[in-house]
From Swiss-Prot:
Function text: Reduces the physiological low-potential two-electron acceptor coenzyme F420, and the artificial one-electron acceptor methylviologen.
Source species of the chain: Methanocaldococcus jannaschii (strain ATCC 43067 / DSM 2661 / JAL-1 / JCM 10045 / NBRC 100440) (Methanococcus jannaschii)
Note describing how the cofactor binds: There are 12-13 Fe atoms per alpha/beta/gamma unit of the FRH.
Lineage of producing organism: Archaea, Methanobacteriati, Methanobacteriota, Methanomada group, Methanococci
Record-given protein name: Coenzyme F420 hydrogenase subunit beta
Swiss-Prot/TrEMBL cofactor(s): Ni(2+); iron-sulfur cluster; FAD
UniProt-listed InterPro entries: Co_F420_Hydgase/DH_bsu_N (IPR007516), FRHB/FDHB/HCAR-like (IPR045220), FrhB_archaea (IPR017679), FrhB_FdhB_C (IPR007525)
UniProt catalytic activity: oxidized coenzyme F420-(gamma-L-Glu)(n) + H2 + H(+) = reduced coenzyme F420-(gamma-L-Glu)(n)
Record key words, sorted: Iron, Iron-sulfur, Metal-binding, Oxidoreductase
Keyword Oxidoreductase on entry: yes
Gene name per UniProt: frhB
Enzyme nomenclature, EC number: 1.12.98.1
Amino acid sequence: MRWNRMNPFGSYKKVVSARSTLKEVLKKAQDGGIVSTAFIYGLENNLLDGVIVADNAGEFKAVPKVATTPEEVLEAAGTKYTVCPNISVLKSAVREYGCEKIGVVGTPCQVRAVRKLMKYPVGFRHVPDKIALIIGIFCMENFPYYGLKLIVEEHCGVKMEDVVKMDIGKGKFWVYTRWGETKAIKLKETHPYEQIACHVCTDYTAELADISTGSVGSPDGWSTVFIRTAKGEEIFNKMVEDGYLEVKPIEEVKPGLGLVEKLALQKKEKNMKEIEHRKELGLPIPY
């Protein structure tokens, strides 16, 4: 188990750069397609019988969905830069779908919530022991849907109905249209539209997940992957052995782990200041 002296990443067993080998995933994936590939692999190999994903309800409105087939996972592939209450369908996955081995993907705060739920299952009887895999995605901040819509339509000048993809990288928020146009604004212009609770979250890399992944640190089309637990290591190794993933040592890619560390520490330091400020004012900390 490795620990950085500043502990920007939490505990992990290893970190690599990886991408899916599944053509159908790469066509829809945001970056390396790690989440979709892991869920497809789990469903195809009886390691999972249901997964909770963020589906696109139209114009990038994210809604939680219980997917039980690889086809349903593919339909939901791709990042949505808006809040999606994935945990709200955990009970449904067990009681309505009859799932016994559930895969969950979420932002760092959602991963933390799932871990708390597993330890203190108040109101979630018979759910914790059904959670088989937790995948976390890197997250600096997120947007409520109305905030995302203002960013896209007011700042980028694009109608939501014309957007085919969004991305965050190189200090900018990118919007790609069905007409082949690309619009971008500086990331700092999006800060007023962030979810308020994001300002007191100190976790960038989903430290409590079995596997954490995000684009930062890896080349275009690849993802940086933290394998954190024995459970995560087992399924990740199986995916590599069975040819579902292509892997490179993180030390051999650019920009590398240094950029991930920079952003992780930046989030911790910035938001710890906000937490202390709120404490001084006697304000509640929603985390």
